[in-house]
């Protein structure tokens, strides 16, 4: 909880607009999450691999998945946050409507479901047999496609000058 409060405080103190603050939170959280695993590897020699199981959250139900899943999610957050900040600093004004937020929330819920599916297995003190990669990747790619469609398509980020 304190980590999230610090991330929110840094974003609040750094930027004025909601979208820039939100983008900063995405970047900071993504970097923090990746370095969390880097330092665990340096100091504890854990995880053994990108496919080592990790308990991500415990509320309201255990969220579990291989280390690679939150790293992919963090890289996606960093990417989206950087695109938003770079384009806004170039003067682009994003037109975000309610549909965008609804679709991104749906993508997030799909990802959360992929982490919670094996929660009961962990409660029973066993290691899950497999991770629902298809569900996770559907949520991740849906979120990225929505991002590109609603934010990037008109900003010329991906086109040559």
Task: Outline where the language-model segments fall.
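Alpha-helical transmembrane segments in multipass membrane proteins, preferentially the mid-helix core
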Residues: 8-13, 73-92
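Interfacial segments of alpha-helical transmembrane regions
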Residues: 16-31, 93-104
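Transmembrane alpha-helix/helix-exit interface in multi-pass inner-membrane proteins
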Residues: 30-48
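Non-cytosolic membrane-interface motifs at loop->transmembrane helix junctions
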Residues: 51-59, 123-135
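Membrane-helix boundary/juxtamembrane motif in polytopic membrane proteins
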Residues: 88-108, 126-130
């Amino acid at each position: 909880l304190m980590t999230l409060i610090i991330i929110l405080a840094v974003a609040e103190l750094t930027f004025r607009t909601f979208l820039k603050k939100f983008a900063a939170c995405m970047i900071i959280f993504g970097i923090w999450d990746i370095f969390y695993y880097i330092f665990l590897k340096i100091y504890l020699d854990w995880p053994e691999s990108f496919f080592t199981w990790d308990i991500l959250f415990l509320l309201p139900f255990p969220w579990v998945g291989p280390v690679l899943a939150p790293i992919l999610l963090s890289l996606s957050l960093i990417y989206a946050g950087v695109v938003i900040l770079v384009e806004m600093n170039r003067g682009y004004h994003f037109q975000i409507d309610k549909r965008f937020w609804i679709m991104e929330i749906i993508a997030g819920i799909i990802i959360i479901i992929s982490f919670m599916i094996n929660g009961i297995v962990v409660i029973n003190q066993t290691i899950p047999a497999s991770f629902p990669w298809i569900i996770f990747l559907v949520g991740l790619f849906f979120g990225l496609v929505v991002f590109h469609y609603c934010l990037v398509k008109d900003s010329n980020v991906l086109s040559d000058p």
